[in-house]
A protein has these predicted regions:
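Boundary at the C-terminal end of the N-terminal hydrophobic targeting segment
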Residues: 8-19
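Intrinsically disordered, low-complexity terminal regions enriched in Ser/Thr/Pro/Gly
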Residues: 18-304, 323-332
């Protein structure tokens, strides 16, 4: 995919000027996937059976892999595996009250302690660095009574303790026999009396098994997902609606759906089933013969491919009354680094636009710059029905790749002649390297209808564009 059709004139080389005191290299260093995804799920269950399930997922890039020698190869290791990593996780669960004080937990005995360990295998060193490959796990316990709980998490990989940005979380175990009737004096708990489950989209309209989301409190950016909501016993389907609001500086409602009978599912019981790969499924079980359904639920597919990369609040409403809610954020694991900061993103556009356009895009306050940025790329979006813009993503992905491939100690890769050529035209069809005895090394990049000739300026891989030809 070529981006050169956006060019209007020769492009100045300097794109280092940034607003807000942050540079692209700083963003690149900060652009690290979360690595550990953690969530909890509460379900109705017979007395004594587990009704709280913890799911967690480790990205391969945060694990500490070591090479497998034949004398320490475990029986379960695939024959193709060359690297192995271990992870351990401990969850300490506490019963708390509305006046919850985190400091008091230091002297409080846990209600329950859960321990888990697992191993991950990789065939190559490149696989060990993948943020999109995962080691999954789960743990569960029986909460003896409804109410407020908190849990603390400790993680280690290959025996090394790993600090977590947030290792203490609170949650509510509803009274499934009397849903919605808890004394929720703490305003922060409003909307937590009925559970909301984020799931993978159903394969068909009659599905009764759903894969629970494995990304903590997040869903994958630009991918639709499903949601299962428990409904109160009273009221017709069309008494309820689901709304989604985008949170943050540009807060607005982005989705509304009034429930219909086709959205409703009935179940005698809900059950969570671990899968062979350690992920979790939730199943809606039929009532036993002669019994009425115990639970009324709604399933919706959420058009997340239409939503921006942001945080959202999903609410189930009965008229003006809040029944349940669930915050989620879009997770873009491999987001191009420039897109983490509007001014860095705009500065990179100097590579593909003329000076007049560049100066216009960068003028105004932050809200105006964001608006103009989106408008620019929306005009060039090959898939306007989706929020995800593949042309924009391709451009900023090439900026990252140019930085990785062509940077020197003095110049970031996107400012080099080779880097800018790569960003505008993509990977060449062929690269010919010449080492003449009487001159500097040369590289000839060949595309379908043009060639670029680069000449080494130092002995450290720095190349300058010296000629271009149309074929």
């Amino acid at each position: 995919m070529m981006l050169a059709f956006l060019l209007a004139s020769a492009i100045p080389a300097d794109v280092r000027a940034q607003r807000g005191g942050i540079s692209y290299p700083q963003l690149r260093a900060q652009n690290v996937a979360p690595g550990l995804y953690l969530d909890h799920h509460t379900i109705p269950a017979p007395e004594g059976e587990d009704n709280v399930w913890m799911s967690f997922r480790f990205g391969y890039d945060v694990l500490q892999f070591r090479r497998i020698d034949e004398d320490n190869r475990r029986e379960e290791a695939p024959q193709s595996a060359r690297f192995m990593a271990t992870a351990e996780l401990q969850v300490q669960v506490y019963k708390v009250d509305a006046e919850f004080d985190a400091d008091r937990l230091e002297n409080q005995r846990p209600f329950k302690t859960l321990n888990w360990s697992g191993r991950a295998y990789a065939d190559s060193f490149e696989d060990t660095q993948q943020a999109t490959r995962f080691l999954d796990g789960f743990a569960s316990f029986a909460a003896t009574e409804p109410g407020r709980y908190a849990y603390r998490v400790r993680v280690s990989t290959d025996g090394t303790n790993r600090p977590l940005r947030r290792n203490l979380r609170r949650f509510m175990v509803p009274d499934f026999d009397k849903p919605g009737q808890q004394n929720l004096s703490d305003e922060a708990e409003e909307g937590n009396a009925f559970p909301v489950y984020l799931v993978e989209p159903a394969s068909d309209t009659s599905a009764t098994r759903f894969q629970l989301s494995s990304y903590g409190r997040s869903v994958m950016y630009a991918q639709n997902f499903g949601v299962i909501l428990q409904l109160p016993e009273e009221g017709q389907a069309d008494d309820y609606k689901v709304v989604i609001e985008r949170l943050g500086a540009q807060e607005e409602q982005v989705f509304e759906h009034s429930l219909s009978p086709s959205d409703i599912r009935e179940a005698g019981m809900l059950q969570i089933r671990p899968q062979a790969n350690q992920s979790l499924q939730i199943e809606l079980l039929e009532p036993e013969a002669g019994n009425q359904p115990e639970y009324r639920l709604a399933y919706l597919e959420i058009p997340n491919e239409e939503f921006r990369n942001s945080r959202f609040m999903l609410k189930l409403m009965q008229g003006d009354k809040l029944i349940s809610r669930r915050e989620f954020r879009n997770l873009w694991i491999d987001i191009p680094s420039s897109l983490l900061n509007i001014d860095v993103a705009l500065s990179m556009m100097r590579i593909i636009v003329d000076d007049e356009t560049f100066n216009r895009l960068r003028s105004g306050n932050e809200a105006e710059r964001i608006r103009k940025f989106y408008a620019f790329w929306e005009e060039r979006d090959p898939e306007p029905e989706r929020e995800y813009n593949p042309l924009m993503v391709e451009f900023y992905t090439r900026v990252d790749e140019a930085f990785d491939r062509f940077s020197s100690l003095q110049v970031p890769g996107y400012e080099t002649d080779q880097g800018k050529t790569y960003i505008r035209f993509g990977s060449p069809q062929d690269i010919e390297r010449r080492l003449p005895s009487d001159g500097p090394a040369r590289e000839i990049w060949t595309y379908e209808n043009r060639e670029f000739i680069f000449e080494a300026t130092t002995g450290f891989g720095d190349y300058k564009l010296v000629d271009r030809r149309t074929r």
